[in-house]
From Swiss-Prot:
Disulfide bonds: none annotated. It comes from Mus musculus. One of its GO terms (biological process) is regulation of protein phosphorylation. GO terms for molecular function: DNA binding; DNA-binding transcription factor activity. This is Signal transducer and activator of transcription 2. Found in the brain, lung, heart, spleen, liver, kidney, muscle and the testis. Heterodimer with STAT1 upon IFN-alpha/beta induced phosphorylation. The heterodimer STAT1:STAT2 forms the interferon-stimulated gene factor 3 complex (ISGF3) with IRF9; interacts with IRF9 in the cytoplasm. Interacts with CRSP2 and CRSP6. Can form a homodimer upon IFN-alpha induced phosphorylation. Interacts with IFNAR1 and IFNAR2; the interaction is direct. Interacts with ARL2BP. Interacts with E3 ubiquitin ligase DCST1; the interaction results in STAT2 ubiquitin-mediated proteasomal degradation. Interacts with USP18; the interaction is direct and allows the recruitment of USP18 to IFNAR2. It is found in: Cytoplasm; Nucleus. The gene is Stat2.
Length: 923
């Protein structure tokens, strides 16, 4: 930053010192501010302290000449005061007896005072917090803009100086030629006078040549300063781009355009100065004894060419790193045979109007690493940029359809990797070369991409991305292709933000300090208190990480995939706590209200999320329950929000209840997740098929409590196995009323097998074939014996609703809903016995308990609707024809009209398919 710019940013006490210094000086502050860049670039020490006044005289006349150039400011009313002050100062310094030396000493002393004030301010700021990064960036941008504006003035001043030198040199050539032709005798007074004039002209030409060289030297110095300011800005942009490739926020979109504007301005100055130096080179043909003008011009030209080479070479960049369209969130990973895109750009937007620029791409251009695979560009490896396109969009080469193919090794199929590195640890570099031509200058420009990992199978994508993360996080050299031959360890101070970037870039929300703390403990353990603890590459992605047997990166990447595919909205809105250890989970929940729950990622499964809640017992014990983790296979069938909404646990009385009441800390469940619930189904809508939905019910096993593997570390925690059940949209409230027990041991199984035991079709015919024999024993209990026997405890209502709805109650009467056709095929024998149990044995081989045959009920014992059915009607019902069945209308019983058809459910003692735990509803 320029010294004057730094002075302007000082606090008030130091600014007061600066005003006091200039109030006591003859040099006005307006002059100091307006020529700040030029003043700071001159060597005032040499002009003030050395005995030779040549340097002071040159600077003195340069100041006078610049002060005389401010006449164009008179057109601007705002510059009237500035113009007046500068003119006054120009008049005041001319009468000085030793004007050049006094002026040089004055400016030199003022610069020393300014440096003293700056040192005091810097010492005072050492104990204060640094300024905001935004303020620093704005200050740097302002300095660059000011320097560019100052260079415009300096270039114009050099142009005028060269023009004046050329005119004076022409005058000297003319006078010298005339003097040589008329030379007669040295004693001629007229000739002596002419010789004196010629000598004076020669001295003036020599002085002006030195001034021009000094002006060009100062201009080269200021251009060097500008380039030194711009290239770090360009490096910052490249670093931001590199970090954005691994998830960090990308650079501002306008950053590249701003850099292009600055770099183009700097290149224009250099090319203009190069043309001016060519003119000076032509003027150097006039030589005299002791003339150093030609050597000075050659030296300036060499400096300009060096600056141009630096600027152009660094300005050729890869604007968009290589990326496949199907994995935009993970650039720098390429698959053989798949297309990928990459874009290069020359940030110096200068192109000849008739010259096309051609870019050529290659893989591993200058490297021959042993054991590394070799690749070729399958498609065209060249891209041509026409002048018309360059003027319209900039000097951009967009490669959109590149494809890599592996080279075949001699004596083998494809080139196999025999090196020390795995395929996902091989780093390859894609290079671009452009033959740049402008104003007669020809230069070969080259740029490289960040190292890429080339895979042959998408299964390698996860480990390849781990390599990209590790390299771009730690490597100081972007071209180090053998980085993984001895991969360095990563400090947590770098690894933590990178892990957070994976979530912020992919699922729109990063990790907070508590979540990062859990990951840090998982990686380094509780005993490690160092902030910069080091983690090896093997521990990050290869070695198993406790408590599960999964490498850390595999576990984390599966969670990323799960959140992106199924939980993105919940994660973005902060509903998922996510990274919580078991101990931390207990500390959070044990002081909360009963029913408070949180969502965390399982540490023992790949891509699993579980729900844990707290319950306070009557004996003041605190129990923490956790559901078996849900993976993507489960969430593909049922969203997590619907699981939370309809989750049920069977209590001791077999009454289903939802234990999830408050999302941690105290947000009501429906308030937290209501906006994510699926739309309610219109119950009055007639459909061709019976609708169904999946809900989750768990059975709280009080007597036979077994802790699963994940809960063995915590004796006070219980993990309840969950099962997906198939039910009608109307079923859930009815289930909660009936208290139906679906099973004693339920498992999470996303594949709902229909089995041959229950048939549910939209037809009006219901076939119920439980076993060779069915024993109906009216009793307060219903026992289902699939494989491990399922016991249904007394409940006021047991509902089995096929298509036409059949209701049997444990009363002496059996009511059958009016329906045109109901086929109930029980078995070859139907035994009715007043016993306390109803046993449905659905297995292929069923052994029936002893039972007594009962008398068939008399007609008076039957319901009124059944008494009206004759034997012929029953035969028709047992063999219905297609004309009795329509899309939205059921066959009618005797005495029933079409308007009597309702959707009122009737309760039945029949139950089926206890093995699956299905509950059937019908309209």
């Amino acid at each position: 930053m320029a010294q004057w710019e730094m002075l302007q940013n000082l606090d008030s006490p130091f600014l007061d010192q600066l005003h006091q210094v200039y109030s006591q000086s003859f040099l006005p502050m307006d002059f100091r501010q307006h020529l700040a860049s030029w003043i700071e670039d001159q060597n005032w020490r040499e002009a003030a302290l050395e005995s030779d006044d040549a340097k002071a005289n040159m600077l003195y006349f340069s100041i006078l000449d610049q002060l005389n150039q401010w006449d164009h400011y008179s057109s601007d009313p705002k510059s009237l005061l500035l113009q007046h002050n500068l003119r006054k100062f120009s008049r005041d310094i001319q009468p000085f007896p030793n004007g050049p030396s006094q002026l040089a000493e004055m400016i030199f002393n003022l610069l020393l005072e300014e440096q003293r004030i700056l040192i005091q301010a810097q010492r005072a700021q050492e104990v204060q917090p640094p300024p905001a990064p935004e303020a620093v960036v704005e200050s740097q941008q302002l300095e660059i803009e000011n320097r560019i504006q100052g260079l415009h003035v300096d270039i114009e001043f050099l142009v005028r100086s060269i023009r004046q030198l050329k005119d004076e040199q022409d005058v000297f050539s003319f006078r010298y030629t005339v003097f040589s032709l008329k030379k007669t005798s040295s004693s001629d007074p007229h000739q002596s006078q002419q010789a004196h004039v010629v000598q004076a002209t020669a001295n003036k030409v020599d002085r002006m040549r030195k001034e021009v060289l000094d002006i060009s030297k100062g201009l080269v110095g200021r251009l060097t300063t500008l380039v030194d300011l711009l290239l770090p800005k360009l490096d910052e942009w490249k670093v931001q781009q590199q970090k954005s490739c691994i998830g960090a926020p990308p650079p501002v979109k306008s950053a590249a355009e701003q850099l292009e504007q600055w770099l183009t301005a700097g290149a224009k100055f250099l090319f203009h100065l190069r043309q001016l130096l060519k003119q000076l080179k032509e003027m150097s043909c006039l030589r005299y004894q002791g003339d150093m003008f030609a050597k000075g011009v050659d030296l300036r030209n060499a400096q300009v060419m060096e600056l141009l080479q630096r600027l152009l070479q660094r300005s050729f960049v890869v604007e968009t790193q290589p990326c496949m369209p199907q994995t935009l969130h993970r650039p720098l990973i390429l698959k053989t045979g798949n297309k990928f895109t990459v874009r290069t750009r020359l940030l110096v937007r200068l192109q000849e109007g008739s010259e096309s620029l051609k870019a050529e791409v290659s893989v591993d251009r200058n490297s021959d690493l042993p054991g590394f695979r070799k690749f070729n560009i399958l498609t065209s490896n060249q891209k041509t940029l026409t002048p018309e396109k360059g003027q319209r969009q900039g000097l951009i080469w967009d490669f959109g359809f590149l494809t890599l193919v592996e080279q075949r090794a001699v004596g083998a199929g494809k080139g196999n990797n025999k090196g020390p590195l795995a395929v996902t640890e091989e780093l390859h570099v894609i290079s671009f070369v452009v033959e740049y031509t402008y104003q007669g200058l020809k230069m070969k420009l080259q740029t490289d991409t960040l190292p890429v990992v080339i895979i042959s199978n998408m299964n390698q994508l996860s480990f390849a991305w781990a390599s990209i993360l590790w390299f771009n996080m730690l490597s100081p050299n972007p071209k180090n292709q053998q980085f993984f031959c001895q991969a360095p360890k990563a400090p947590w101070s770098l690894l933590g933000p990178v892990l957070s970037w994976q979530f912020s870039s992919y699922v729109a929300r990063g990790l907070d300090s508590e979540q990062l703390g859990m990951l840090r403990t998982k990686l380094f353990g509780k005993s490690c208190k160092m902030e910069d603890a080091l983690l090896s590459w093997v521990d990050f992605c290869k070695r198993e990480s406790p408590p599960g047997k999964i490498p850390f990166w595999t576990w984390l990447d599966k969670i990323l995939e799960l959140v992106h595919d199924h939980l993105k909205d919940l994660w973005k809105d902060g509903r998922i706590m996510g990274f919580v250890s078991r101990n931390q989970e207990r500390r959070l929940l044990k002081k909360m209200l009963s029913g408070t729950f949180l969502l965390r990622f399982s540490e023992t499964s790949e891509g699993g999320i579980t729900c844990s809640w707290v319950e306070h017992q009557d004996d003041h014990k605190v129990e923490i329950y956790s559901v078996q983790p849900y993976t993507k296979e489960v969430l593909q069938s049922l969203p997590l929000t619907e699981i939370i909404r309809h989750y049920q646990v069977l209590a001791e009385e077999n009454i289903p209840e939802n234990p999830l009441r408050f999302l941690y800390p105290r947000i009501p469940r429906d308030e937290a997740f209501g906006c994510y619930y699926q739309e309610k189904v219109n119950l009055e809508e007639q459909e061709e098929y019976l609708k169904h939905k999946l809900i989750v019910i768990s059975n709280r096993q009080v007597d036979e409590l077994q802790q699963p593997l994940e809960l063995k570390q915590d004796s006070e925690s219980l993990e309840v196995n969950a099962e997906l059940l198939l039910a009608h949209d109307q079923e859930l409230p009815l289930m909660m009323q009936t208290g139906l027990v679906l099973g004693t041991e339920l498992k999470v199984d996303p594949i709902l097998s229909t089995a041959p035991q229950v048939l549910l079709e939209p037809a009006p015919q219901v076939l119920l074939e439980p076993a060779p024999q069915v024993l109906l024993e009216p009793a307060p209990q219903v026992l289902l014996e699939p494989a491990p026997q399922v016991l249904l405890e007394p409940a006021p209502q047991v509902l089995l609703e096929p298509a036409p709805q059949v209701l049997l109650e444990p009363a002496p009467q059996v009511q059958l809903e009016p329906a045109p056709q109901v086929l109930l095929e029980l078995a070859p024998q139907v035994l009715l016995e007043p016993a306390p149990q109803v046993l449905l044995e659905l297995a292929p081989q069923v052994q029936l308990e002893p039972a007594h045959l009962l008398q068939q009920p008399s007609e008076s014992d039957l319901p009124e609707d059944l008494q009206q059915i004759s034997v012929e009607d029953l035969k028709k019902l047992s063999n219905p024809s297609t004309e009795y069945i329509t899309t939205n209308e059921n066959p009618m019983l005797a005495g029933e009209s079409s308007g009597d058809e309702t959707s009122i459910p009737y309760h039945s003692h029949f139950d089926a398919d206890g093995l699956l735990g299905w509950t059937l509803d019908t309209f």
